[in-house]
């Protein structure tokens, strides 16, 4: 068995994850073979198993990296917003853009492939992943619900609602007839406007009602 330095191990593992990302994006999980990945990285199959126990474990690594990158992008976008209302709008715009442009993000959020894969892993494989806990998705929902103008007080409800919205915007592409549907970006804007307005109490309107 070939022995690698720590630097080489880090490099090869990164190359495997990147090659896996490209192949899984292009062909999907089922049609991608370990041989395809090892040929892309120019290593033998036996070397692959020094880094990952199975194709499933490689796919988990790919999806986890995509998840972490998504969280970083959303966090950066939200951090640049000036108000909670702008934070929600920016978060939704970023999520919608990512789901439409990145098939792996769509599979991660809409199809929940990461959790489905984790459920299929052996106990020892799941234990090996326990040392790398996931980032907190939509953690700012905990802060939003503390805002007096925010309509809901349950952050889990907010997170689940956002996931449902992302599913809705992705699924509309699957059911619409070509040439008859509204431009997706226009639909997204209308949906985001409606959601943002619905999540926050209109202080002026409430004052008038009183």
Q: Where in this protein do the model-derived segments appear?
A:
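Helix-turn-helix
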Residues: 15, 23-57, 61
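Hydrophobic alpha-helical connector segments
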Residues: 57, 61, 72-105, 158-162, ...
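Amphipathic alpha-helical packing segments from all-alpha helical-bundle domains
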Residues: 68-71, 119-149, 156-160
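Amphipathic alpha-helical segments used for helix-helix packing
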Residues: 86-90, 99-123, 171-175
